[in-house]
C-alpha cells in the first residue's frame, strides 16, 4: 500500500527536477567599487579619444569634480585641452587654481555685460550660463557631471554619453560624463589616492577636505538660497550687481518689467528674497506703507548706494 503525503493548502509543493538558481542581485552603477568606476571612466575616455585625432575639451570649472576628470584624462593618456570658461564672477582664487593646473582660461564676455544687456538672472531665467559658459569650443567635451549631485541631474542624465546643442545655431557637441555614477565618497577617496590639490575653498582652517562643499558663481540664483549667503558674505557683490543693473534699467524699455517694478532695486529684492511676485508685492506694499527697497538693501547689507 503506497504512502500518501497530505499537504496543507499553503504548504510548498515538493520541488521536482533541478532546483532553480537564485538570481544574483544586479549591482547599480553607483554601488560599484571605486576601482571599477575608475576602470570604466578610463575606458570611456580612451574610446572617445580613439574616434578622432583632435583633442577633447576637458570642461574645467575649478571645482573638485573638474579636478577629478582632469586627472582621469591625464591617466587615460588622451589628447585633450583643459579649458576654463571665465564667468568673471567665480569665487576668488579660481583663476589661480586653473593656472596652477595648466588649464586654459577663456572668456567670451563678462557677467557685467550680461546684466547690462539682459538684467538680473533668476531661478526661472538662467540665461547667464548660456552667455558665459555653455558654448562650443571643440566637437567633443568631457564634463564632471554626477547624478548624485541632485535629483534633477539624476533624472536628466542616465547614460555617460550625451549630445548637446549650443547656441542659436544649434552647434553639436558630443559630451562624455566619466564620473556620472560617482558619489561624494568616491570623489573624496580618488582625490586622496591621487594626491590632488583642490581649490583652497574646499579646505577648512585645519586643512581638512570637505567633499560636500560646492563652488559656483557668486550669487548664483540656482543655489538653494538664491545666492543670499554669497551676498551677505560679500556686500560689494551686491553693489556690483546693482550698479550694472541700473545701466540695464536705464537703457532698456522692458515695459512688462517696469509695469511690475518701480526700480532695479525692487527687481533685485524680489529675485533674492521672494519665491513669487505676489509675495513680494504684498510685502513691500502693506498696511504700514510702501517699503523703500533701496533703503532696505542699504540697511540689510550695510552698504551705501
Task: Briefly describe each language-model feature range.
Residues 2-194, 303:
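ATP-dependent adenylation/nucleotidyltransferase module used to activate substrates
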Residues 7, 14-23, 199, 203-305:
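ATP/NTP-dependent adenylation/nucleotidyl-transfer catalytic domains that generate, transfer
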Amino acid at each position: 500500500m503506497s504512502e500518501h503525503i497530505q499537504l496543507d493548502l499553503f504548504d510548498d509543493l515538493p520541488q521536482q527536477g533541478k532546483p532553480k538558481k537564485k538570481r544574483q542581485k544586479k549591482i547599480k552603477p553607483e554601488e560599484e567599487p571605486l576601482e571599477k568606476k575608475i576602470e570604466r571612466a578610463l575606458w570611456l575616455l580612451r574610446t572617445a579619444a580613439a574616434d578622432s585625432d583632435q583633442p577633447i575639451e576637458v570642461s574645467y570649472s575649478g571645482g573638485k569634480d573638474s579636478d577629478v576628470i582632469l586627472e582621469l584624462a591625464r591617466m587615460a593618456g588622451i589628447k585633450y585641452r583643459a579649458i576654463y570658461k571665465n564667468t568673471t564672477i567665480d569665487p576668488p582664487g579660481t583663476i589661480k587654481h586653473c593656472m596652477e593646473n595648466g588649464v586654459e582660461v577663456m572668456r567670451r564676455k563678462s557677467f557685467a555685460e550680461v546684466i547690462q544687456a539682459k538684467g538680473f538672472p533668476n531661478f526661472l531665467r538662467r540665461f547667464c550660463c548660456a552667455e558665459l559658459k555653455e558654448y562650443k569650443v571643440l566637437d567633443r567635451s568631457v564634463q564632471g557631471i554626477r547624478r548624485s549631485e541632485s535629483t534633477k541631474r539624476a533624472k536628466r542624465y542616465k547614460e555617460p554619453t550625451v549630445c548637446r546643442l549650443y547656441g542659436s545655431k544649434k552647434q553639436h557637441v558630443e559630451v562624455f560624463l566619466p564620473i556620472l555614477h560617482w558619489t561624494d565618497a568616491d570623489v573624496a577617496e580618488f582625490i586622496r589616492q591621487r594626491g590632488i590639490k583642490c581649490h583652497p575653498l574646499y579646505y577648512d582652517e585645519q586643512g581638512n577636505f570637505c567633499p560636500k562643499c560646492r563652488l559656483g558663481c557668486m550669487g548664483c540664483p540656482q543655489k538653494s538660497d538664491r545666492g543670499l549667503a554669497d551676498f551677505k558674505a560679500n556686500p560689494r557683490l551686491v553693489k556690483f550687481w546693482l550698479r550694472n543693473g541700473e545701466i540695464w534699467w536705464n537703457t532698456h524699455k522692458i515695459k512688462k518689467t517696469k509695469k511690475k517694478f518701480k526700480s532695479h532695486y525692487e527687481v533685485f529684492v524680489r529675485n533674492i528674497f521672494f519665491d513669487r511676485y505676489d509675495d513680494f508685492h504684498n510685502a513691500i506694499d502693506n498696511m504700514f506703507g510702501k517699503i523703500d527697497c533701496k533703503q532696505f538693501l542699504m540697511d540689510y547689507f550695510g552698504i551705501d548706494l
